[in-house]
């Protein structure tokens, strides 16, 4: 985003904290910070914050758990990301059926895929382990709850949260 010269649309990076502990507090994405910030920004241009949020799209930069052949039980191999096969687009997250979930629309996923392909970005899809196998939380659900299109995009990580990650 730093190299983006004279963009046609507003571009921004939002950095937040507390993702691993529920995204609560005034620095977490589950706070009112993001909608208030966008509302203040929109007001400068004579726009309504809620309309700006609804028209926005977000790539949530979060890692994905790569398939681990030495600890394969939590993974569904055909739906897992692999190390060295590009960034991972994670269409949906959540557990217990559809609890705590975010699910990017097919249209938004299509636009992201097209963007990757047009810019020769190597990418893959993957889920965060077997459904209801535990883990798999991201901040995408908080962004989606604002009525914003969002998808998780990040690198696959082997042995996530272990003392030694790859």
Where do the language-model regions lie?
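Acidic/histidine-rich catalytic neighborhood of metal-dependent amide-processing enzymes
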Residues: 2-88, 134-135
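His/Asp/Glu-rich mid-to-C-terminal helical/loop segments that flank catalytic regions of hydrolases
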Residues: 2-12, 155-166
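Active-site-adjacent substrate-binding region
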Residues: 66-71, 75-162
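Predominant activation on well-ordered alpha-helical scaffold segments within soluble catalytic domains
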Residues: 1-2, 35-39, 109-113, 140
């Amino acid at each position: 985003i730093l190299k983006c010269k004279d963009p046609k649309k507003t571009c921004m990076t939002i950095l937040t904290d507390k993702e691993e502990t529920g995204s609560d507090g005034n620095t977490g994405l589950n706070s009112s910070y993001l909608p208030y910030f966008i509302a203040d920004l929109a007001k400068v241009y004579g726009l309504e914050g809620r309309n700006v949020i609804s028209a926005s799209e977000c790539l949530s930069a979060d890692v994905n758990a790569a398939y681990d052949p030495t600890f394969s039980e939590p993974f569904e191999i055909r739906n897992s990301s692999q190390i060295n096969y590009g960034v991972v687009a994670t269409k949906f997250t959540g557990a217990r059926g559809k609890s705590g979930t975010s699910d990017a629309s097919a249209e938004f996923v299509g636009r992201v895929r097209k963007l990757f392909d047009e810019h020769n970005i190597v990418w893959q899809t993957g889920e965060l382990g077997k459904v209801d196998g535990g883990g798999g939380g991201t901040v995408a659900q908080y962004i989606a709850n604002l009525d914003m299109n969002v998808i998780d995009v990040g690198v696959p990580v082997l042995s996530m949260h272990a003392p030694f990650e790859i």
